[in-house]
């Protein structure tokens, strides 16, 4: 199984989620509103940046756990529908998942997703 985490622009959320909902068997997606900054922001920072001076940019984090064979399709859809070509489009992380346990039923593995 794979956990896919994506950091995207907020205005791309609807496009991405509409496309993801068309994937047969997609177990679901968790969406969080987050803030942060990337390399380009950090490169422009002065040597000493106080916490108050850092501008955090609003972003959306998508998280989904899928079977290995579904991971490429999910990644490709997120990349395709969140891409603008501009700095700050975001990142997609793919992480191996050793185990999943569904709390309500104690199911494990793929069945728990």
Annotate each PLM feature:
Residues 1-113:
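Positively charged, small/polar-rich N-terminal and surface patches that mediate targeting and assembly
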